[in-house]
Curated annotation (Swiss-Prot):
Pfam assignment, any one: Acetyltransf_1
Biological function: Aminoalkylphosphonate N-acetyltransferase which is able to acetylate a range of aminoalkylphosphonic acids, including (S)-1-aminoethylphosphonate ((S)-1AEP) and 2-aminoethylphosphonate, using acetyl-CoA as acetyl donor. Its physiological role in S.typhimurium is unclear. However, by acetylating (S)-1AEP, PhnO would protect against the deleterious effects of (S)-1AEP, a structural analog of D-alanine that has antibacterial properties.
Extra facts: Reaction proceeds via an ordered, sequential kinetic mechanism with AcCoA binding first followed by aminoalkylphosphonate.
Classification lineage: Bacteria, Pseudomonadati, Pseudomonadota, Gammaproteobacteria, Enterobacterales
Assembly and interaction partners: Homodimer.
Catalytic activity: aminomethylphosphonate + acetyl-CoA = 2-N-acetamidomethylphosphonate + CoA; (S)-1-aminoethylphosphonate + acetyl-CoA = [(1S)-1-acetamidoethyl]phosphonate + CoA
Alphabetized InterPro entries for the sequence: Acyl_CoA_acyltransferase (IPR016181), Bact_Acetyltransf (IPR050832), GNAT_dom (IPR000182)
Listed SUPFAM superfamilies: Acyl-CoA N-acyltransferases (Nat)
Name by which UniProt lists this protein: Aminoalkylphosphonate N-acetyltransferase
Organism: Salmonella typhimurium (strain LT2 / SGSC1412 / ATCC 700720)
Assigned EC number: 2.3.1.280
Length: 154
Protein backbone atom coordinates (compact mmCIF):
# COMPACT_ATOMS: atom_id res chain seq x y z
CA UNK A 1 0.00 0.00 0.00
CA UNK A 2 1.44 3.42 0.82
CA UNK A 3 3.59 5.25 3.26
CA UNK A 4 1.83 8.61 3.31
CA UNK A 5 3.80 11.73 2.45
CA UNK A 6 2.70 15.29 2.85
CA UNK A 7 2.36 17.38 -0.30
CA UNK A 8 4.88 19.92 1.00
CA UNK A 9 7.55 17.19 1.13
CA UNK A 10 7.79 17.27 -2.68
CA UNK A 11 9.26 20.47 -4.09
CA UNK A 12 7.21 21.84 -6.99
CA UNK A 13 8.98 21.27 -10.30
CA UNK A 14 6.08 22.24 -12.53
CA UNK A 15 2.66 23.85 -12.45
CA UNK A 16 -0.27 21.57 -11.63
CA UNK A 17 -3.87 22.31 -12.60
CA UNK A 18 -7.19 20.55 -13.04
CA UNK A 19 -7.95 19.17 -16.49
CA UNK A 20 -10.90 20.44 -18.54
CA UNK A 21 -12.52 19.37 -21.79
CA UNK A 22 -10.17 21.83 -23.52
CA UNK A 23 -7.35 19.47 -22.55
CA UNK A 24 -8.84 16.46 -24.34
CA UNK A 25 -6.20 16.35 -27.09
CA UNK A 26 -3.31 16.65 -24.63
CA UNK A 27 -4.72 14.00 -22.30
CA UNK A 28 -5.45 11.72 -25.26
CA UNK A 29 -1.81 12.04 -26.42
CA UNK A 30 -0.54 11.23 -22.92
CA UNK A 31 -2.75 8.16 -22.57
CA UNK A 32 -1.71 6.92 -26.01
CA UNK A 33 1.92 7.40 -24.93
CA UNK A 34 1.25 5.41 -21.76
CA UNK A 35 -0.34 2.57 -23.72
CA UNK A 36 1.99 2.82 -26.74
CA UNK A 37 -1.22 2.52 -28.74
CA UNK A 38 -3.90 4.77 -30.22
CA UNK A 39 -7.41 4.57 -28.84
CA UNK A 40 -10.74 5.37 -30.48
CA UNK A 41 -10.68 9.18 -30.18
CA UNK A 42 -14.44 9.73 -30.08
CA UNK A 43 -14.95 7.10 -27.38
CA UNK A 44 -12.03 8.60 -25.44
CA UNK A 45 -13.38 12.15 -25.79
CA UNK A 46 -16.86 11.13 -24.64
CA UNK A 47 -15.56 9.10 -21.70
CA UNK A 48 -13.17 11.84 -20.61
CA UNK A 49 -15.96 14.44 -20.74
CA UNK A 50 -18.23 12.17 -18.66
CA UNK A 51 -15.47 11.52 -16.12
CA UNK A 52 -14.86 15.26 -15.74
CA UNK A 53 -18.45 15.58 -14.51
CA UNK A 54 -18.02 12.81 -11.91
CA UNK A 55 -17.16 14.32 -8.50
CA UNK A 56 -15.23 11.15 -7.58
CA UNK A 57 -12.85 11.40 -10.55
CA UNK A 58 -10.00 13.91 -10.43
CA UNK A 59 -7.57 14.70 -13.26
CA UNK A 60 -4.50 16.83 -12.64
CA UNK A 61 -2.15 18.02 -15.37
CA UNK A 62 1.53 18.91 -15.04
CA UNK A 63 2.68 21.86 -17.14
CA UNK A 64 6.11 23.18 -18.03
CA UNK A 65 6.26 26.51 -19.85
CA UNK A 66 2.52 26.25 -20.45
CA UNK A 67 2.76 22.85 -22.15
CA UNK A 68 1.13 19.71 -20.74
CA UNK A 69 3.91 17.23 -19.91
CA UNK A 70 2.14 14.81 -17.58
CA UNK A 71 -1.09 13.83 -15.90
CA UNK A 72 -2.58 11.73 -13.14
CA UNK A 73 -6.09 10.45 -12.54
CA UNK A 74 -7.46 9.76 -9.08
CA UNK A 75 -10.72 7.85 -8.65
CA UNK A 76 -12.27 7.96 -5.20
CA UNK A 77 -14.22 4.80 -4.36
CA UNK A 78 -15.82 3.40 -1.23
CA UNK A 79 -14.56 -0.18 -0.93
CA UNK A 80 -16.76 -2.52 1.06
CA UNK A 81 -13.81 -4.77 1.96
CA UNK A 82 -12.15 -1.76 3.63
CA UNK A 83 -15.36 -0.12 4.87
CA UNK A 84 -13.64 3.08 3.83
CA UNK A 85 -12.72 5.33 0.94
CA UNK A 86 -9.77 4.41 -1.26
CA UNK A 87 -8.04 6.65 -3.79
CA UNK A 88 -7.26 4.62 -6.89
CA UNK A 89 -4.66 6.06 -9.23
CA UNK A 90 -5.73 4.77 -12.63
CA UNK A 91 -3.33 6.68 -14.87
CA UNK A 92 -0.02 8.43 -14.24
CA UNK A 93 2.08 9.39 -17.22
CA UNK A 94 4.89 11.86 -17.91
CA UNK A 95 6.24 12.48 -21.39
CA UNK A 96 9.48 10.51 -21.92
CA UNK A 97 11.79 13.56 -22.32
CA UNK A 98 10.46 14.94 -19.01
CA UNK A 99 10.92 11.79 -16.93
CA UNK A 100 13.44 11.77 -14.11
CA UNK A 101 12.65 15.38 -13.19
CA UNK A 102 10.32 14.64 -10.23
CA UNK A 103 7.17 15.51 -12.20
CA UNK A 104 5.70 12.07 -11.47
CA UNK A 105 6.55 12.48 -7.79
CA UNK A 106 4.80 15.84 -7.70
CA UNK A 107 1.69 14.42 -9.39
CA UNK A 108 1.67 11.44 -7.04
CA UNK A 109 2.05 13.68 -3.97
CA UNK A 110 -0.91 15.74 -5.18
CA UNK A 111 -3.09 12.62 -5.59
CA UNK A 112 -2.11 11.28 -2.17
CA UNK A 113 -2.94 14.56 -0.47
CA UNK A 114 -6.22 14.88 -2.39
CA UNK A 115 -7.19 11.35 -1.30
CA UNK A 116 -6.14 12.05 2.28
CA UNK A 117 -8.24 15.22 2.37
CA UNK A 118 -11.23 13.25 1.05
CA UNK A 119 -10.90 10.79 3.94
CA UNK A 120 -9.26 7.89 2.10
CA UNK A 121 -7.32 5.39 4.18
CA UNK A 122 -4.87 4.65 1.34
CA UNK A 123 -4.10 5.02 -2.32
CA UNK A 124 -3.67 2.07 -4.61
CA UNK A 125 -2.73 1.50 -8.22
CA UNK A 126 -2.03 -1.15 -10.79
CA UNK A 127 0.75 -1.10 -13.34
CA UNK A 128 1.45 -3.38 -16.25
CA UNK A 129 3.81 -6.23 -15.39
CA UNK A 130 6.07 -5.09 -18.28
CA UNK A 131 6.61 -1.57 -16.88
CA UNK A 132 9.66 -2.26 -14.75
CA UNK A 133 10.70 1.41 -14.61
CA UNK A 134 7.24 2.23 -13.22
CA UNK A 135 7.58 -0.55 -10.63
CA UNK A 136 10.87 0.93 -9.42
CA UNK A 137 9.32 4.42 -9.34
CA UNK A 138 6.39 3.32 -7.18
CA UNK A 139 8.65 1.39 -4.80
CA UNK A 140 10.83 4.51 -4.41
CA UNK A 141 7.67 6.49 -3.68
CA UNK A 142 6.80 4.20 -0.77
CA UNK A 143 4.31 1.84 -2.42
CA UNK A 144 4.34 -1.86 -1.60
CA UNK A 145 3.36 -4.69 -3.92
CA UNK A 146 0.45 -6.23 -2.06
CA UNK A 147 -1.92 -7.77 -4.63
CA UNK A 148 -2.11 -9.59 -7.92
CA UNK A 149 -4.51 -8.23 -10.51
CA UNK A 150 -6.20 -10.51 -13.02
CA UNK A 151 -7.92 -9.39 -16.21
CA UNK A 152 -10.04 -11.11 -18.83
CA UNK A 153 -11.00 -9.65 -22.19
CA UNK A 154 -14.72 -9.70 -22.91
Amino acid sequence: MILMRRREDVMPVCELRHATTEDTDSVYALICELLKNELDYQAFRDGFAANLLDPNVHYRLALRNGEVVGMISLHMQFHLHHANWIGEIQELVVLPPMRGQKIGSQLLAWAEEEARQAGAELTELSTNIKRRDAHRFYLREGYKQSHFRFTKAL
